[in-house]
Amino acid sequence: MKNAIVKFSLTALAAFTLAACGSSGGSSDNTAAPSNEQKTQATPSKTNLPTQNSTKANQNQTFTGSAFVISEQDDKVQVKNVKFNNANINQLEVDGQTITLTYPGIYAGSWQRINNTAVCCGKYANVRMGVSLSKGPTEKDILFYNGAPTQNMPVTGLASYKGDSIILSDDIGDDSDEVVGQSSFDVNFGAKTLSGSITANNVPTINISANISGNSFEGTAKSTKLTDGAVEGKFYGNNALELGGLAKANDNSWGAGFVGKKQ
């Protein structure tokens, strides 16, 4: 996966868009948007659901997001999971590295690419997901998600989420080893279960199955052609309006990030 992410800096990042907001101007980095970019923002459900007491929901849910810090040693991919405890969607501190997620006067509703960092997406109010790429083979790549976790989790009812994803793998079988795509999830708050998928062009679908605990979820990530793995994530915003997370193969051969919004 390390080789895939290093290659990512030279290929897929060119597909991300950067939009300028207002009279402050934009960046000369602007490129064509991915064909799978979602053009509209879904309207959240207006159903009023019972909610968990915020203290109970967060007894052991103190982290706000996490990152995979990816390096290569002796031709083996090494992945370290780093937890965040700061609900900052503008900047992250990861393994001694500062990652800027937003810039004054610049807005990108879809993927935003500045320098070696790609972030998704301005259309989400409470969560960000993306990748910060190394500038050379001796540096580390960082795949991350973070945001403002839900304090009032629903305890009954069903919800569906749709959003964005990125998949990085040596086994995609395309000209590049990475691709942006979509995410789709169904949640049963009463049963505390989440199921869904991460999809992208030319990539075997990654099926997600997880159990919910508080405002977090953990489970499995499986595909017909990719190695099985694990998934983690959290719900963000009022009444679990949005979600985000990461998935990774058990043998580190692929990794993925995803975000979604309640429909």
Predicted region positions:
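Mature soluble binding/inhibitory domains
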Residues: 22-263
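C-terminal motif of bacterial Sec signal peptides marking the signal peptidase cleavage site
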Residues: 18-20
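Generic detector of short alpha-helix boundary/capping microenvironments
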Residues: 9-10, 221
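Bacterial N-terminal signal peptides that target proteins for export
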Residues: 1-9
